[in-house]
Regions:
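Mid-to-C-terminal alpha-helical segments outside catalytic/metal-binding sites
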Residues: 1-16, 23-84, 112-120, 141-145, ...
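Surface-exposed, active-site-proximal loop segments in enzymatic domains
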Residues: 90-106, 137, 202-205
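Alpha-helical scaffold segments that form or flank carboxylate-/histidine-based iron centers
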Residues: 129-134, 138, 238
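Short coil-to-beta-strand
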Residues: 79-89, 193-194
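Soluble or luminal CAZymes and related metallo-dependent hydrolases
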Residues: 65-69, 106-113, 138, 166, ...
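Aromatic-lined substrate-binding rim segments of carbohydrate-active enzymes
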Residues: 74, 78, 99-108, 167-182
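Catalytic pocket-lining loop regions of alpha/beta-barrel enzymes
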Residues: 5, 118, 145-304, 308
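Short glycine-enriched loops at secondary-structure junctions
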Residues: 133, 189-195, 315-317
Length: 351
């Protein structure tokens, strides 16, 4: 069913899109330099070697839209009925950069750049903080600065940082800052690290088609099984793309996790206070970015509850107006649809 897409809540809810990307020229130039000088990993060469250099319509259009935080983006939001966009620096952020000082500088300048545009469009944009996990203490300070001084409402990290994962205790300053500020962490996909990407590259499966979800789902699962929510019970973590497949594997994940604990298969695998299912229902938010598919959305709502799912478009990578209509036309209750499109995001991001 086709209908006109309008902002303003004419269907009983406003549309808050929760995984929307922007970039800075400085960031993309750094990627291009790394691709050309051989310091980029294989995933970055595959993904940004395409987007930063290809003359194809898709690549040039996405770069143009990533760099725009002005009239074009607002027009696209108006044309698709998006009332509010939650914006974050596009993946992989500054995490691939080998020079930590450069990474911190680009992250800080991108946060200030975003803040200027949030101030220009305060009713349309919400900011998320970019950090450089290469320096966890600096990242914690930047989370506090952006929350207190810039009014940002969350933090995005693009999965692994040069093959390192957030379950390493050295990243705890980031989690302490998140809990102190009462803000969610959004773990956005990145291309898999060199240690796992080879068989994906051989079949063209390294990006959004499969590699993103497989690697990011594993990251969240690592955090859960290593006890992140036992240590930080008030922490909220968001993941996109209908949970990076975890809701669909949840029965077997829970079963085999418990079996491994009972068998003491791994010395480092310790019992958790709750089941993995419980943590997903209580501490994790799922967004529909890139997954405008009714069976998947309804299944995830059934398994995790309608308070755990939020709408996202994944602009500019998947700017498809009919996918907004798909969400509007979901065969769920009006109350569940309002949670999906508006009030869950308002709760999680404290809007």
């Amino acid at each position: 069913m086709s209908h006109e897409l309008k902002t303003g809540g004419d269907r009983g809810y406003k549309r808050i899109a929760t995984e929307e990307a922007f970039a800075t020229r400085e960031q993309i130039d750094a990627y291009l330099r790394m691709v050309r000088d051989g310091t980029a990993d294989k995933g970055m060469v595959s993904l940004w070697g395409f987007y930063a250099t290809s003359p194809s319509e898709r690549a040039t259009q996405i770069i143009d839209r990533l760099l725009d935080l002005g009239e074009q983006r607002i027009r696209h939001m108006d044309e698709t009925g998006i009332d509010v966009a939650v914006l974050a620096l596009t993946a992989p952020g500054v995490q691939p950069l080998l020079d930590v000082a450069e990474a911190k500088g680009i992250a800080q300048r991108s946060n200030d750049h975003l803040a200027e545009h949030v101030a220009r469009y305060p009713d349309r944009y919400v900011g998320m903080t970019a950090v450089a996990p290469q320096d966890p203490e600096w990242s914690a300070a930047e989370i506090r600065r952006c929350g207190r001084d810039l009014g940002f409402k969350g933090v995005q990290i693009a999965s692994h940082t040069q093959g390192e994962y957030l379950d390493d205790p050295k990243f705890d300053p980031i989690f302490r800052a998140l809990v102190d500020m009462g803000q969610p962490l959004y773990i956005h996909p990145s291309t898999p690290p060199d240690s796992m990407i080879a068989p994906m590259l051989e079949a063209g499966l390294d990006g959004a088609i499969f590699g993103f979800g497989g690697e990011t789902g594993m990251h969240l699962l690592r955090l859960i099984t290593k006890g992140i929510f036992d240590r930080y019970p008030d922490l909220t973590i968001c993941v996109g793309h209908m949970g990076e497949a975890l809701p669909f594997w949840l029965y077997r994940i829970d079963f085999m996790h418990q079996a491994g604990i009972r068998a003491q298969r791994h010395d480092f695998l310790k019992p958790l206070k709750k089941t993995i299912h419980d943590y997903l229902r209580e501490n994790v938010m799922i967004t529909t970015s890139g997954m405008a598919w009714e069976p998947a959305i309804k299944f995830t709502m059934e398994v995790l509850g309608d308070e755990r799912v939020m709408y996202a478009m994944d602009y500019p990578y998947q700017y498809i107006p009919d996918e907004v209509r798909t969400h509007d036309n979901l065969s769920i209750t009006d109350a569940a649809k309002r949670k999906l499109m508006q009030t869950n995001a308002e709760r999680v991001f404290n809007l």
